[in-house]
Amino acid sequence: MISIKAALSLAAAIPALVPALVPASPRPVQGAEAPAGDTVTTERLVTEITGFLDAEVAAHLSAVPTLNPPPALVLGVPTKGDFTWGSFMRAITDVAALTGKRAIAGRDVPETLGRLGLIEARLGGKTFSQLGAALALREFGTDLEANPLWRSLTRPERREWRELLDPGRFYDRERKQVIDLPENYFGVAARIVTMDHQMGLVDRDFADELLERAAAQFRRGALYTDDSLPTGRFDRYSQEYARFVYEAAGNVGRRDVQEAVAPSLTAVMRTWWDLVSPDGYGYPWGRTIGAIGYMDTMDIVGFLAAHPRFRPAPLSDLAGAYWAAWQWLQGDYRRDRHLLDMFGFGRGNYHYMTPERQWQQTTSFMAKAAGSLRHLQAALRQEQVASFPARPPLPAVARFESFRKGDRPAGVWLVRQGALRFALPFTTGPKAGIADYLPAPHGLPGFAVPVEQFLPALVPYLELDDGRRIVAGDGADVIEPSADGRGLHAVWRLWTVVGGPPARPVDVGLTSTVDWAIDGGTLVRKETIEAARPVVVRRFEVALPTTAGDLVTHWDGSQRFDRLVGDEARSEVVVEGSSPLDVSAKATGDSAVGRGARGPVPLILMYSAENLTLVPREPFTWIVRYDVRWQARAGEAASTTFGNR
């Protein structure tokens, strides 16, 4: 049997021979779980995480020899990416608060934070850079006359800090819009301006005005915020946006705004709990996930510890998810380099997450870990939770959650049934047809899409005779979940053009009807494409990207069975079509289509057909069956293939 895994392991090892051979942390296995029955004490949780953060933030600060001028490199990676110094400020602030230390690596914390803020002020830092500065300043008191950070600044430096804390750097007060940014940045602006008001830097009218603008979608009754109004982009940012606006309203005592946001928080927290994986991973679709999906879990649990009314589960169970996420991030942390391995072999990132942001993402992880642990440890001790499960006891789930109703509804089908678990979203992405946002079973063991790539991942691309490629995505025309939640029916009469702007559906004379069903441990997808008038499909193609390293193909007569074997899952895939489908397999190496959010996508199975002529009453149908519980049958013959047969 040919092993793709072995070839990839060799390829991954070659660049590692160049630097000094220092042992790194064990790499996490996607979807790995702690043994059932294991428990963790609260004391261990607090001691382990606090000790790590204390040592690592000191190591990071020691790696910054001077702040004037700021170094171009820290720990061997660039510092010119977005939010660099603001994230570092937040990490130092939260770790100092967690440990109770006033000095780190021999440096006075308030004075160091004051210098870091001046770097961001002079670089024109915006959004999360400003948020980090506001949180750092407020940590030392809202009375600036007694605030040691503020007192460490000269009068001209205080003017620079005031400019840094002005949300007008990215919020247009006249138009009441964030400037060229997604909707969730209203939450960032609201947190900054309300902290500014707490510290006497802006008047109450401005704080209330911006807060009301940030709360607009919630005021209109939205449970899930559209991050790109009005296109219908729903992803991880819905929960972050809701948390941010709720916290901002709390800063200025706006209970009315908090109550407007409360229904959203109840909904998004339940959805997060229904989709979180056993290893603590959050939203499996959309942008800015990967390691951030685990940081989200820590952030969310910290929020829920402080706000018990929104908890979807007991605190001890939430702590189990927190611990699982922490363990994954520890496995991803390169202690020899003091960095998260976000650009390791087979790791994909959205285009804005450049190598210039590796250090920033690492310090952001430290900040989120320290900030969330402060809330979690307080709640665990107050509620006398001495220990909790190392693996979160996640409930069985089979339901559809609506994001938006109307002519083009959106939502997500959530399934957690034994080994079969996934989230299948109906939403738009930054570009039509991008794999991260397709209505595919994201999080399904053994299945993973490459990051920010155009790949027909279990959702076909159809190339028409005029050269356009279309896909059934960007919400749907009809979404009908079954009564028991174990099936779903969706219809697309309007399609989107792959690579084009989102939410611009086109009528090409075709209708796609898709039925998903759970059959034991098998997920079944059946699609029927019908024509209202003759339509030539120059090429039909659909892909199955997998985390498996080994492919074994078995034939039973004319029926092909593909077995996908990897660390995460052993799956069997059967694909059939009413017209013959060519099958090929591609080993991706370290190409763009081989980079997943959490690790490599070593292999892609491609199914295709050319020159299909669809006419009324003669539909094209294809079916895929994905069994996550496959075990080899005794005496069965097998062959391995990487090409067409």
Residue map of PLM features:
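Signal peptide processing junction and immediate N-terminal pro/mature segment
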Residues: 19-33
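Beta-strand-rich recognition/accessory modules
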Residues: 576-645
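Aromatic-lined, polymer-binding surfaces characteristic
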Residues: 76-301
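Extended polysaccharide-engagement surfaces of secreted carbohydrate-active enzymes
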Residues: 278, 282-285, 292-597
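Extracytoplasmic/secreted proteins, especially bacterial periplasmic and envelope-associated proteins
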Residues: 44, 48, 52, 87, ...
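Bacterial N-terminal signal peptides
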Residues: 7-23
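Low-complexity, Ser/Thr/Pro/Gly-enriched N-terminal "stalk/linker" regions
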Residues: 32-111
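N-terminal secretory signal peptides that target proteins for export/translocation
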Residues: 1-4
